[in-house]
């Protein structure tokens, strides 16, 4: 059995030799063939999860394929500083020591973060190595390294100067724990809440309007109530005033089409400082904007006696007070969608705050270029999602209230001058004063990672890292990147932002091809979660099975546009495949001690020519599938060639022609090159075993040339296909009369194409040996009193003379009776309306499928009985 412990040793040898670097395959590189793929930089706090494993596996398959195909390859690795996540980790660590970050101050806290990063961050890099991926590790980047800090400042200043980055008071998404969030950092979830109907009395009147709201704690910030202009019920109240309960402040009744007449009573409160839609209404009607709580969600002086309470805690107390004063008409159960912080799961508040924004106009050029087809999406339907999101793009809030991250390079002088600068200024450019300070906020993490496709190639780095981790010609050679592979879930977080940030600078889309894979789920299609107990940890899978087995399993399941349904059964299936090709090596080495490279021999064996023809078909299909990112089809093609064509038939047929083994071994070695991008370690191991070499003292298979397709004579495939069909058909006929593994005296073959028998005669030894027949005769007529097996191109006859059929007939009748009982039982269940209505859908489907299978089995047994009875 294959020893998976070799994987670490093999990886280390290849990394030390520099095979993963740009010129690691120098000896086979072809002119003007460049390939670049960017690793989505995982969080420095992260560990390898199954989604990473899928992304990195698919990226590495393409990287290894292109490297072996003569391309100069850059697989760019990196880590993301992960602002909020990293700051939270270090803050919690300090709190265990009784230290708050505020006690340290910003500068010392950031030093602590860097210490943590060097000691504990980046564990995921070692886990990537165990997966066998081959990025150019010497070029490892970190989104806070000095070169990328320079690039971020350059990008910011250029956008600032173009007025594409602006600062202003906006209604934003605000997390009371993590600060400002962009729209896509808010996750909306179904919420079981309440709808409060509150009486707002008209000024100087006993009449009142009933206002329906889900947020009674914000009513101190109401600056109007509104009705729909076409709602006749309330037309007479428009422009009058109502009195706010408790505070007794008078506010106006306005008419606005934003109101849904059917919602609640048709009268809604307007709180412009605490609701996205009300914010727009406030602008339209020139209303006051009154914030009723601070950045931590604590109610302020506008809330009178409730000042100092936390917003959600205050709700019940405010409602209780309103009830005691008779202002609550009724409270209803109400389901709605509420936004939560994607990071800490805190309820997000619409909040007016002065923040930095990237204007949506930045995206226009990238939208136009995508429309021209300059980037292709795989699967193609993702272009529709991309276009829809870009069409509705809003200004992007990029400032974050953190200490860890890229501090915004904007400076404020006491003379009121504001300016952006790539380099730390010594004096104010307007008044020459030294009394200025830098903006305290940092940039959204996605701003720096949005530059990844070009900043890692040296753009904006100034001279930091030049000729060590990037070179002057990198942008020319590798931009646009050839391919991006990532999960569809970060299309808008990351991919779209790289598209518009890079295009705005370089006026070219950053990627030629974009492959978006689906989610990895369990075999039932459920998301993996600890609560369901269905999480497959790639680190554990690698320990139990091997990196190769995990990689090949993921590739087999990676169908474009479909979720990957991963299970231990699938991993076991690939383990069996691994054992199959390992045993093929054992068989070959039983017959020969060493095998030549295929290019150094001439094929003489007809069997070897046939297997070589099948191999060439495999080469063609694998290349075509990889070129179109159909990873599952490429993996399936390899699986079928090794399992069916080579192991099941090549090896079996070679037992009738031992002289073919030497040539088959050379073909097997060449096929291992085809497999190498998917299963780099076992292919390396088997290749050296068959070559009688060791990786320690020989070049790796990973820098050998990837097999190229060569057209073959189809006639040899036709002949051997008929031989195999004959063997299978004879075996099937023998099994019907319980002679499965016994040698029989004679079998008759009737070919549909009568001319073919003359060509087949030269290969009769294969049929005689593998079908276990002493003699084969060709027939042009059907034989009476014979068992018959009909297949696509031929019929097989075995005479029934001297064969006792009574036991066989009894066995088949018993099988038939048993299947009929099972079929009757399932039919009854599926005819029962109560069962169909109450049973889980998947159970009903399973029963329908089982019934279909029973019908097929019954039909087959009936045909067998009919044949045996004549």
From Swiss-Prot:
EC category: ligase
Annotated catalysed reactions:
tRNA(Val) + L-valine + ATP = L-valyl-tRNA(Val) + AMP + diphosphate
* A single MF term (Gene Ontology): ATP binding
Pfam families noted in UniProt: Anticodon_1, tRNA-synt_1, Val_tRNA-synt_C
For this record, an example GO cellular component is:
cytosol
| Parts forming coiled coils | 800-870
> What Gene3D superfamilies does this protein's entry cite?
2.170.220.10, HUPs (3.40.50.620), Isoleucyl-tRNA Synthetase, Domain 1 (1.10.730.10), Valyl-tRNA synthetase, C-terminal domain (1.10.287.380), Valyl/Leucyl/Isoleucyl-tRNA synthetase, editing domain (3.90.740.10)
Q: What is its EC number?
A: 6.1.1.9
Q: Which GO terms describe its biological process?
A: valyl-tRNA aminoacylation
Signal sequence, start to end = none
Q: Where is this motif: 'HIGH' region?
A: 42-52
Q: Which UniProt keywords apply?
A: Aminoacyl-tRNA synthetase, ATP-binding, Coiled coil, Cytoplasm, Ligase, Nucleotide-binding, Protein biosynthesis
Where does the record place it? Cytoplasm
The organism's superkingdom is given as Bacteria
Q: What is its main location?
A: cytoplasm
The residue numbers the entry assigns to motif 'KMSKS' region are 527-531
Query: Which InterPro entries does the record match to this protein?
Result: aa-tRNA-synth_I_CS, aa-tRNA-synth_Ia, Anticodon_Ia_Val, M/V/L/I-tRNA-synth_anticd-bd, Rossmann-like_a/b/a_fold, tRNA-bd_arm, tRNAsynth_Ia_anticodon-bd, Val-tRNA_synth_C_sf
Any idea which positions bind ATP? 530
Which SUPFAM superfamilies does the UniProt record give?
Anticodon-binding domain of a subclass of class I aminoacyl-tRNA synthetases, Nucleotidylyl transferase, tRNA-binding arm, ValRS/IleRS/LeuRS editing domain
NCBIfam families, A to Z = PRK05729.1, valS
Q: What does this protein do?
A: Catalyzes the attachment of valine to tRNA(Val). As ValRS can inadvertently accommodate and process structurally similar amino acids such as threonine, to avoid such errors, it has a 'posttransfer' editing activity that hydrolyzes mischarged Thr-tRNA(Val) in a tRNA-dependent manner.
Task: Provide the family line.
Answer: Belongs to the class-I aminoacyl-tRNA synthetase family. ValS type 1 subfamily.
> What does the subunit comment say?
Monomer.
Q: What is known of its domains?
A: ValRS has two distinct active sites: one for aminoacylation and one for editing. The misactivated threonine is translocated from the active site to the editing site.
Q: What is the name of the protein in this document? A: Valine--tRNA ligase
Tell me what organism the protein belongs to: Campylobacter jejuni subsp. jejuni serotype O:2 (strain ATCC 700819 / NCTC 11168)
Q: Which gene encodes it?
A: valS
């Amino acid at each position: 059995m294959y020893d998976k412990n070799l994987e670490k040793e093999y990886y280390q040898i290849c990394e030390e030799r520099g095979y993963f670097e740009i010129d690691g395959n120098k000896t086979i590189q072809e002119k003007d063939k460049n390939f670049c793929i960017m690793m989505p930089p995982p969080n420095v706090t992260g560990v390898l999860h199954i989604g990473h494993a899928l992304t990195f596996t698919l990226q590495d398959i393409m990287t290894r394929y292109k490297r072996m195909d003569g391309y100069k390859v850059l697989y760019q690795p990196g880590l993301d500083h992960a602002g909020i996540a990293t700051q939270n980790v270090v803050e919690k660590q300090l709190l265990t020591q009784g230290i708050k970050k505020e006690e340290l101050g910003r500068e010392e806290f950031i030093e602590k973060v860097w210490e943590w990063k060097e000691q504990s961050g980046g564990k995921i890099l070692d886990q990537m190595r165990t997966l066998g991926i081959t990025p150019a590790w010497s070029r490892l980047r970190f989104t806070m390294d000095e070169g990328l800090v320079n690039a971020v400042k350059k990008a910011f200043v250029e956008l600032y100067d173009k007025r594409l980055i602006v600062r202003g008071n906006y209604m934003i998404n605000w997390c009371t724990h993590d600060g400002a969030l962009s729209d896509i950092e808010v996750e909306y979830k179904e919420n079981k809440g309440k709808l409060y109907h509150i009486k707002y009395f008209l000024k100087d009147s006993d009449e009142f309007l009933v206002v329906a709201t889900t947020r009674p704690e914000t009513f101190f910030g109401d600056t109007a109530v509104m009705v729909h202009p076409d709602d006749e019920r309330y037309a007479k109240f428009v422009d009058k005033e109502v009195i706010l309960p408790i505070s007794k402040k008078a506010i106006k009744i306005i008419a606005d089409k934003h109101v849904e007449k059917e919602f609640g009573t048709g009268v809604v409160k307007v709180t412009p400082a605490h609701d996205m839609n009300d914010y727009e209404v406030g602008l339209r009607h020139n209303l006051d904007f009154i914030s009723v709580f601070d950045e931590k969600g604590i109610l302020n002086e506008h809330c009178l006696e409730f000042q100092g309470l936390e917003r959600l805690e205050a709700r019940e107390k405010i409602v209780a007070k309103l009830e005691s004063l008779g202002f609550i008409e009724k409270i209803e159960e109400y389901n709605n969608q509420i936004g939560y912080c994607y990071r800490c799961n805190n309820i997000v508040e619409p909040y007016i705050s002065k923040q930095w924004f990237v204007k949506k106009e930045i995206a226009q050029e990238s939208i136009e270029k995508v429309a021209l087809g300059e980037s292709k999406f795989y699967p193609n339907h993702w272009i529709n999602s991309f276009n829809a999101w870009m069409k509705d793009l809003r200004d992007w809030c990029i400032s974050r209230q953190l200490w860890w991250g890229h501090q915004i390079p904007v400076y404020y002088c006491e003379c009121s001058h504001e300016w952006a600068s790539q380099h730390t200024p010594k004096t104010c450019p307007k008044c020459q004063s030294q009394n200025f300070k830098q903006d305290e906020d940092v940039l959204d993490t996605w701003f720096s990672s949005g530059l990844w496709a070009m900043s890692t190639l040296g753009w904006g780095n100034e001279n930091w890292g030049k000729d060590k981790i990037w070179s002057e010609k990198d942008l020319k050679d590798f931009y646009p990147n050839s391919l991006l592979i990532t999960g569809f879930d970060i299309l808008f977080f990351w991919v779209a932002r790289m598209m518009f940030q890079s295009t705005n600078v370089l006026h070219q889309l950053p990627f030629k091809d974009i492959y978006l894979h689906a989610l990895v789920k369990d075999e039932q299609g459920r998301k993996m979660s600890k609560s369901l107990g269905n999480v497959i940890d790639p680190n554990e899978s690698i320990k139990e099975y091997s990196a190769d087995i995990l990689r090949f399993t993921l590739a087999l399941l990676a169908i474009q546009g479909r979720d990957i349904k991963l299970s231990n059964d699938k991993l076991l299936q690939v383990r069996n495949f691994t054992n199959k090709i390992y045993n093929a090596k054992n068989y070959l080495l039983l017959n020969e001690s060493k095998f030549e490279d295929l290019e150094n021999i001439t094929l003489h064996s007809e069997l070897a020519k046939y297997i070589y023809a099948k191999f060439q078909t495999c080469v063609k299909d694998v290349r075509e599938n990889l070129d179109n990112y159909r990873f599952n089809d490429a993996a399936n093609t390899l699986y079928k060639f090794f399992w069916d064509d080579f192991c099941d038939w090549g090896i079996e047929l070679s037992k009738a022609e031992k002289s073919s083994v030497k040539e088959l071994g050379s073909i097997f070695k060449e096929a291992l090159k085809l497999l190498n991008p998917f299963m780099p370690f076992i292919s390396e191991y088997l290749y050296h075993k068959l070559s009688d070499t060791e990786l320690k003292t020989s070049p790796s298979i990973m820098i050998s040339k990837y097999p190229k397709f060569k057209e073959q004579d189809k006639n040899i495939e036709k002949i051997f296909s008929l031989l195999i069909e004959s063997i299978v058909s004879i075996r099937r006929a023998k099994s019907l009369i319980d002679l499965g593994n016994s040698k029989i005296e004679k079998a008759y073959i009737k070919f549909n194409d009568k001319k073919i028998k003359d060509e087949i005669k030269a290969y009769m030894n294969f049929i005689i040996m593998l079908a276990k027949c002493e003699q084969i005769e060709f027939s042009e007529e059907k034989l009476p009193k014979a068992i018959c097996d009909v297949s696509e191109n031929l019929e097989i006859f075995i005479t029934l003379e001297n064969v006792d059929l009574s036991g066989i007939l009894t066995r088949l009748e018993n099988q038939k009776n048993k299947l009929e009982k099972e079929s009757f039982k399932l039919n009854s269940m599926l005819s029962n309306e109560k069962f169909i209505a109450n049973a889980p859908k998947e159970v009903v489907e399973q029963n329908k499928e089982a019934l279909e299978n029973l019908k097929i089995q019954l039909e087959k047994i009936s045909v067998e009985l009919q044949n045996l009875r004549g």
